[in-house]
Amino acid sequence: MTRYQDDFYDAINGEWQQTAEIPADKSQTGGFVDLDQEIEDLMLATTDKWLAGEEVPEDDILANFVKYHRLVRDFDKREADGITPVLPLLKEFQELETFADFTARLAEFELAGKPNFLPFGVSPDFMDARINVLWASAPSTILPDTTYYAEDHPQREELLTLWKETSTNLLKAYDFSDEEIEDLLEKRLELDRRVAAVVLSNEESSEYAKLYHPYDYEDFKKFAPALPLDDFFQAVLGQVPDKVIVDEERFWQAADQFYSEEAWPLLKATLILSVVNLSTSYLTEEIRVLSGAYSRALSGVPEAKDKVKAAYQLAQGPFKQALGLWYAHEKFSPEAKADVEKKVATMIDVYKERLAKNDWLTPETRDKAIVKLNVIKPYIGYPEELPERYKDKVVDENASLFDNALAFARVEIKHSWSKWNQPVDYKEWGMPAHMVNAYYNPQKNLIVFPAAILQAPFYDLHQSSSANYGGIGAVIAHEISHAFDTNGASFDENGSLKDWWTESDYAAFKEKTQKVIDQFDGQDSYGATINGKLTVSENVADLGGIAAALEAAKREPDFSAEEFFYNFGRIWRMKGRPEFMKLLASVDVHAPAKLRVNVQVPNFDDFFTTYDVKEGDGMWRSPEERVIIW
């Protein structure tokens, strides 16, 4: 029997870990995933009733979801149609002869939801987060991160070979010949090599403040003289922009490697494969399963999701917020909403008091931190209204499933471009209410807690206040802490990139965050080594979350440190496949679940007194090595 003093996570979760079985179609199981599975089961059962015409809500948007779901579930028609629905689009790209043929249709492809290899988007300006601006990013790589392309990376050749094998099998299902497949994949891999040589690694892209490179539009155009950008932006924006924010500077400095006559054969092959990948979910069952083979292998998942579950997941995509709103109204009581709102307000008050008593910040920086905290916007449970564009997602029952999906994509693309040069919409939710998650948005300075996470084991009106604070309390305070993590600290109360620290305070902050980096850096997870720098912002948020939640718990008359720490250890219960855990160690900004418990709790004196942890015990950490930031 593992003692709490030696391995806190295992003492709580070890027995469960030994017997827990990971479903064959999943990479992991545990707290978050189990809750997500419960919700999926409920939604599957409910939407099955709707398909049968039972208990269908009187709602036009959900009525269109049901129609779309019916199209997705018509497996017989999908099998009969085969690849026919995508053939016109494939032909369109195969008939592009020259780079000029392609560039003449850039805007048309963009607005139609067709591939064009242009990584533009609209998001808040870092320097004035109240307005949306144009950003220029970069395409993603085939391998999980640029670090995988190093000559000495142990998985490089293995994964590239795997990608080629799985892609070959997929393309055969689209009736490409062996010669065509070999040619397409070699060209795609060559373009991918070029991308991997210049795009940011996950570690580099995790430092937000270093991603902001503003360019005057005329200067930006010089990166890619072969692209008719004036015509493109006139078509999608109605005018040319005055500036472009570039987060992937190296990519655009090398733009002629991607957008040129020389690169055209590679780009054309990539576009054809993009059309294939765009269509895989909407055609036959064989194609759907083949298309997921590479990602399943990366995560060690032995089986594809069954077709009924996959159909629900696909159908809900364009209607997620509407389904989330239905779920929240069914499952999230007004009493629970009021209680969580109170908890969030309490947590913000605790944070203010902790900041006011902070002994390593000067009053100047401390006051500015409190200003930021005072205007943080909490969103609890569900959005007050659905996005207006959902009314435009009307199913054409005479069109194919694939064509309906493209039509829905056009609605989203039109909406995305319409935000350019407009004020930021603070009412917009980034995830639906039935998703088991939460987030902080540094550009909007808001925290969001969907209804799905506001239940056991994270939160339950029937469990003790200390258990709730160790669960949802720590999650709430974690998201608040993101306002002051290594990324959030660079943004002011309006979400703008601004240095609001004194030089000495920021130096002290960096010193403390370096200690957090050191605590995690080099830790082992299933044979993979944790990168303390990649995970630092999430680890700082965890640390601040525990500190504030623990203090809030202490204010309750029934406070129990044991129940607090125990539930904190329990919510991170997780069992993952070895391949998946190794992948996470390379690419995830979150530390593995076990380390989020075992590396964090020894920073708190209360942990040592509660569990009588002594020097020589596995969980021991000397007082001078403990770190508290917020």
Segments predicted by a language model, with ranges:
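Active-site-proximal beta-strand/loop segments in catalytic clefts of secreted hydrolases
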Residues: 11, 139, 450-452
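Short secondary-structure subsegments characteristic of cysteine-rich extracellular domains
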Residues: 24-47, 179-198, 468-474, 561-565
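Amphipathic alpha-helical core segments of compact helical bundles
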Residues: 316, 320, 324, 477, ...
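Active-site-surrounding "flap" and adjacent substrate/cofactor-binding loops of secreted or lumenal enzymes
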Residues: 2-7, 11-73, 77
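Noncatalytic, helix-rich "gating/capping" subdomain that lines the substrate-entry/channel surface
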Residues: 50-342, 346
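Short, solvent-exposed loop/turn and secondary-structure capping segments
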Residues: 19-23, 121-123, 145-147, 199-200, ...
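Hydrophobic/aromatic-rich, well-ordered segments within soluble, folded domains that form packed cores
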Residues: 1-18, 153-172, 536, 543-549
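Zinc-dependent metallohydrolase catalytic domains
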Residues: 5, 41, 59, 63, ...
